[in-house]
Design a protein with these regions (language model features):
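PPIase-associated folding chaperone regions across multiple families
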Residues: 27-32, 39, 136-213, 257-369
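Bacterial N-terminal signal peptides that target proteins for export
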Residues: 2-12
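N-terminal targeting/tethering segments
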Residues: 28-143
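C-terminal motif of bacterial Sec signal peptides marking the signal peptidase cleavage site
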Residues: 20-24
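Second-shell loop/turn segments in exported
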Residues: 34-39, 79-94, 103-113, 143-148, ...
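Peptidyl-prolyl cis-trans isomerase
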Residues: 217-262
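Extended intrinsically disordered, low-complexity coil regions enriched in Ser, Thr, Gly, Ala
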Residues: 114-120, 228, 238, 301, ...
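Solvent-exposed loop/turn and edge beta-strand elements of beta-rich ligand-binding domains
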Residues: 1-2, 15-18, 43-57, 121-122, ...
């Protein structure tokens, strides 16, 4: 079984779902055996949809907490499209399930199937899930053993379909398309000063001249050093002012993060060359050195990113085409009974078992797509 499948199984089995003290106070009774999505070959139950929704709920609330955000009332908050966050999340779950159904439906076109070994792993995972969760949790989720087995089967097809669906994607990327240059630069900011009351005040001309003089001092020291191509620019910057520093970065033709004037200056240089004047950018003065016109490591990484982007676009295009032709009905009446609220909260408990380092790492990484 590959790493992705292990992660999916870890999420559903090793991560035991538990109810909070308030669970059950805010949801209508749902019948998990009712059909939620009915397609050409498969029917996904409300219980399965509810399980996927709770997995998403746990992940989102955990992420919000990790980022220091509050979760109280988050599901009732409005999004840009006018729906609540809860409604948007439910819509997303439906799209996830529809996609998995279609991937399974088209699996034979790519000679993809679930092996006996994978079926055995799924059966074992389902058994562990049912044993690990309390009767109260299972009833609240309104899932049956067959629901979890179907979900893990759909996950398996989803995982196995990506490679054959993207096999014909052009993986050739020329250096000219992916080229990344490596530079080192010192930035002396001329942005407005922030006052104690939170307001801002622009720098005076004299203050800006002082900033430019600092940048000039850094440049002069760098050019006067024994080997400007290899000199530590950060050390020189701090010799001028302890608050100054230098940064190493890479950029490509499509870069929009770095200052335009800084990039223009860097592009005129060869390996190891220092731009011989202070660059006046937007709200800053810069000293810049081009370390490598073509950073091989960064360029190869960019090539990989471009190929992955091509594959993802091809994969999504196929899925979208299938969705347009698909006849999948949604049981809106029953799905409406499934809600997200502060009064219906789930937790994800990690198993109290010893694991190998690789397995332990995967348990913490497992995420629901």
């Amino acid at each position: 079984m590959n790493r992705t499948m292990k992660k999916l199984l870890c999420l559903t089995t090793a991560g035991v779902l538990g109810l909070s003290a308030l669970a059950g106070c805010g949801s209508k009774k749902i019948d998990g055996t009712k059909p939620l999505l009915t397609g050409k070959e498969d029917t996904v139950t409300v219980g399965t949809g509810n399980l996927v929704l709770r997995m998403n709920q746990v992940q989102m609330m955990s992420y919000m907490s990790m980022m220091g955000g509050g979760t109280t009332g988050m599901w009732e908050q409005k999004t840009e499209d006018g729906k609540t966050y809860g409604e948007q999340t439910k819509d997303s779950v439906l799209e996830q399930l529809k996609a998995m159904m279609l991937l399974k439906e088209h699996a034979a076109d790519y000679k993809v199937s679930v092996s006996d070994e994978e079926k055995k792993s799924i059966e074992e995972a389902v058994k562990k899930f049912m044993e690990a969760n309390t009767k109260e949790t299972i009833e609240k989720l309104s899932v049956q053993q067959s629901d979890i087995e179907q979900l893990l089967t759909l996950f398996t097809y989803q995982n196995k379909m990506y490679d054959p669906m993207t096999a014909d994607v052009d993986t050739n990327v020329e250096d000219t398309e992916a080229a990344q240059s490596a530079i080192t630069y010192c930035k002396v900011s001329t942005a407005d000063k922030t006052n104690e009351d939170g307001t801002t005040t622009p720098l005076t001309d004299d203050e800006k001249n002082e900033k430019k003089a600092q940048a000039q001092s850094v440049l002069d020291k760098l050019l006067a050093s024994e080997d400007p191509a290899k000199e530590d620019v950060d050390t020189i910057a701090k010799e001028v002012d302890e608050n100054l520093s230098a940064l190493d970065t890479t950029f490509g033709a499509e870069d929009t993060l770095l200052d335009e004037k800084l990039l223009e200056a860097a592009k005129t240089l060869q390996d190891g060359q220092v731009y011989e004047s202070v660059v006046e950018g937007e709200n800053a003065y810069y000293v810049v050195r081009t370390d490598q016109v073509l950073d091989r490591e960064a360029t190869d990484a960019e090539k990989e990113r471009i190929v992955n982007e091509r594959k993802q676009e091809a994969y999504q295009k196929l899925l979208d085409e299938w969705k347009e032709k698909a006849e999948i009905t949604v049981n809106e009446k029953e799905w409406k009974k499934v809600t997200l609220s502060d009064n219906d909260v789930y937790t994800l408990k990690q198993p109290e078992t010893e694991e190998t380092p690789e397995e332990g790492t995967e348990n913490t990484e497992g995420t629901q797509e």
